From Swiss-Prot:
Proapolipoprotein C-II is synthesized as a sialic acid containing glycoprotein which is subsequently desialylated prior to its proteolytic processing. Residues 66-74 are annotated as: Lipid binding. Keywords: Chylomicron, Glycoprotein, HDL, LDL, Lipid degradation, Lipid metabolism, Lipid transport, Secreted, Sialic acid, Signal, Transport, VLDL. GO terms for cellular component: chylomicron; high-density lipoprotein particle; low-density lipoprotein particle; very-low-density lipoprotein particle. Residues 78-101 are annotated as: Lipoprotein lipase cofactor. Residues 1-22 form the signal peptide. One of its GO terms (biological process) is lipid transport. PANTHER family: APOLIPOPROTEIN C-II. This is Apolipoprotein C-II. The keyword Signal applies.
Length: 101
C-alpha cells in the first residue's frame, strides 16, 4: 500500500472519530426524550388496536351463525389437507436428500 493511501485512510478514520464524539456530546446536552423506536412501536400499537376494534365491530354487525359454521368447517378441512400434503412433501424432500441406499 502506498503512503498516500494510508494517509487518506488515517484522515478518514480521524474525521469519523471526531464525528462520533461530536454526536455523543450533542446527544448528552439534550434532555432525554423517548426513543424513536418506542414512538414507532406506540404508534403501530395504537393503529393495530383501532383496526382490531373496527374489525371486531364489523364482525359483530355481520355475524351469521350459518356462515360461521361453514367457515369453521372449511378451516378444519383445509388444515387437514395441508397437514397431509405437508407430510407428503416432507417425505419427498427427505428421500431426495437421503438418496438411494
Amino acid at each position: 500500500m502506498g503512503t498516500r493511501f494510508l494517509l487518506a485512510l488515517c484522515l478518514v478514520l480521524l474525521v469519523l472519530g471526531f464525528e462520533v464524539q461530536g454526536a455523543q456530546l450533542s446527544q448528552q446536552d439534550e434532555p432525554p426524550s423517548p426513543a424513536l423506536l418506542t414512538q414507532v412501536q406506540e404508534s403501530l400499537s395504537s393503529y393495530w388496536e383501532s383496526a382490531k376494534a373496527a374489525a371486531q365491530k364489523l364482525y359483530q354487525k355481520t355475524y351469521l351463525p350459518a356462515v360461521d359454521e361453514k367457515l369453521r368447517d372449511l378451516y378444519s378441512k383445509s388444515t387437514a389437507a395441508m397437514s397431509t400434503y405437508t407430510g407428503i412433501f416432507t417425505d419427498q424432500v427427505l428421500s431426495v436428500l437421503k438418496g438411494e441406499e
